[in-house]
């Protein structure tokens, strides 16, 4: 057998694990009120994990069905971040309550915490998002942060949640800013997947990339109208796009359809204390502009330049950040910015999935010129 034949055989027999979707999704207005039987099948002693605000917001929705199903529940706040210390506290809470399943409520960090502790304790997980800010309620992935809120690493989980309940009535109570951030996070799927996997010939990856393009188009077409009419059918469709469809793309694409520079920029910015007042999707949305600016400056990519101008118009329309100043980082020092770029360019960073090399100085130039007119500040490799 030749080396080429051996390689082809190895590739053909390789085993890939896909965690595409939650086992069940119950969505709709008042979905929680209809989910009693679906929740109760996981056990009798749920531990409800969330942030303090999310726990308070979901209590009127959850408590009636918990009482109806005669479930003995306990609540615990995950803390400020999905960190190793907070996960240790949550594992202790599982043992203390003798929980047989977890109900995660809240936004991205709360749900990541709930999913990961359920994974570690090998018990079922139900996710109930309180906003449309991320697709965390869907995915088999948790992001770990330091106690100071700086991104550290991510953990791939054995499966997606056992039950996902997007209740539009509950999600509508979240500040509109969370949906705007969710739009920013979701739309990044296209700009990152098309770069990291756009040339793949694998069926599922092609499908994931094309779904990301469809997701982008839905958000371009419907976001402004959705934000003007919270609770409307269009609003529900955009909510589905940010929470559900974004998760589908990650599930189908798997580990080979990954984030690129937009999330690398986000990860670097989390190491700056001044960035902690902004949401995940807001930093990612800004990171998309940085990624396109890099393609424009380092490759003279005119399609990237056009896409950046299109996004700037869209961001203005719905209120996504376009500059460091918009992120509340207008007064950071050069040293702080350099630190963020060095972290974003570390050897294991997603930024290296770009088809060209990026060094911190080039990234810094892109980060301070996201709104530059087309054709300005080209940099040669």
Where are each of the predicted segments found?
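Generic secondary-structure signature for well-ordered alpha-helical cores
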Residues: 40, 67, 71, 95, ...
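C-terminal charged capping/lid subdomain of soluble metabolic enzymes
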Residues: 2-4, 302-381
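Active-site segments that bind and position negatively charged phosphate/pyrophosphate groups
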Residues: 201-317
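A glycine/threonine-rich phosphate-anchoring loop and its flanking beta-alpha core
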Residues: 23, 119-211
